[in-house]
UniProtKB/Swiss-Prot annotation:
Mn(2+) 1 binds at residues 125, 128, 233. The active site is at 434 (gmp-histidine intermediate). It comes from Plasmodium knowlesi (strain H). Keywords: GTP-binding, Ligase, Manganese, Metal-binding, Nucleotide-binding, tRNA processing. This is RNA-splicing ligase RtcB homolog. Catalytic component of the tRNA-splicing ligase complex. It catalyses: a 3'-end 3'-phospho-ribonucleotide-RNA + a 5'-end dephospho-ribonucleoside-RNA + GTP = a ribonucleotidyl-ribonucleotide-RNA + GMP + diphosphate; a 3'-end 2',3'-cyclophospho-ribonucleotide-RNA + a 5'-end dephospho-ribonucleoside-RNA + GTP + H2O = a ribonucleotidyl-ribonucleotide-RNA + GMP + diphosphate + H(+). Mn(2+) 2 binds at residues 128, 265, 359. Belongs to the RtcB family. HAMAP family: RtcB_euk. One of its GO terms (biological process) is tRNA splicing, via endonucleolytic cleavage and ligation.
Amino acid sequence: MKQGSRSEGARGDIRGYIQKTGERNLYRIKKGLVPNMNVEGHMYVNDKLKHLIDDEIEMYQLNRNSTFLPAVVQIANVSTLPGIVKASIALPDVHAGYGFSIGNVAAFDMSNEKAIISPGGVGFDINCGVRLIRTNLFYEDIKDKQDELAQLLFNNIPVGVGSQGCILCNQDKLDEALCLGMDWCVKEGYAWVEDKLNCEDNGRSFYADSNYVSVRAKKRGITQMGTLGAGNHYAEIQIVDEIYDKRSAKLMGIEKKNQVCIMIHSGSRGLGHQIATDALIEMEKSMTKYKIDVIDKQLACTPIHSKEGQNYLKAMGSACNFAWINRSSMTFLARQTFAKIFNQSPDDLDMHVIYDISHNIAKMEDHLVDGKMKKLLVHRKGSTRAFPPFHPAVPLDYQYCGQPILIGGTMGTYSYVLTGTDKAMETTFGSTCHGAGRALSRNKSRNTLNYMDVLQKMKEENISIRVASPKLIMEEAPESYKNVSEVVNTCHEAGISNKCFRLKPVAVIKG
């Protein structure tokens, strides 16, 4: 297949290759949809969400000369990559992305010398993720201060595309930070020791080596530490709206409805984007060297154990550390904000991190494949780790309930906390959904939604909102996304994650 031809490959009526299985909410994408599939695709979607998948397919089939590829074709394309095992997996928030769809999980056998690593399987915002902080406050404590809290958070947390961070950082400090992750934050006084214990990988990637991060990437990152960014990134003040699993919620410090939490969704900013861009350029060159031919040039990749593959892992690990520092820095700012308004210390307010999780990452993990334990490189792009109770990677506090999974909703809608399951380990490489997933493009949202209508809806829901860029009001409106409750329910019914509790926003801060 000629590299660069994005609309070739899918054969006939795509829907003929999608088959419902006997498992709840699980479809097969059969081999043959595109040439040279090594494994089939697995897609988790319920009846209410499947029409969005069908809409993407119909748009593609009406205009095959377009550069647009629907998520189903992208899932099939990923299955052609060298070294992939079991299946290319689509989760219910899946939608078209760069090379890999967003909401895709793909794992590659590290014992296979041809197995690859691909920046498209991680995404440009490396270690984009979510952090949830609890408090001992309840809605009654904040309802008269809701607008004041929203404004002070907006003032304290730098937002927007060109925002600059509050953490002054020189080149030496940045290099140290990129290698140490949250350990650097603890050392510098921006995080508590216990914060990192309830963080995926303890907030530090040991792949990281800042020597493999370009000067340009460092230049973009040095001013952005502790910044929210724009797009779908946010900081929200939320209240617990529903508790489904009281035992697990209690382990997370959540015991009653209306308890106040803070959710932060952000990533590695310009540094991560530049690392991804640099890697894609290098990998496009290296594919000729390693005789790799991809069905779509956006799937640029290289063998995991090659020099280029190892260089990307080290740079990607550095971006992961930057993102954990970024969310930790904003946690520091959120704690300061609450301390000022309530005239109590963050410790007195019980502002502890419940968990921090990534949904754009590639990681070496052990998984059972065809009855054998194998070391795999698991790519999760727009998908979240979902490890079960008693897994060694799950923090001590959560050994009995499984790993907390933080699912951010859309502006003005619910967010969820889930827990990991054994079924996820068996079927999805210990993975589940990450959020709502876009239903409308940003351009379509701007053209079809009304700014004032969206604001009025937020007002009716008694949600305070602060946003740096007005166009984001339409782009990030709930109508632009899939129904997050349907996404979460699909995964719960399929058994790949369990619902624990639901959160409702009362204040939203966006770039």
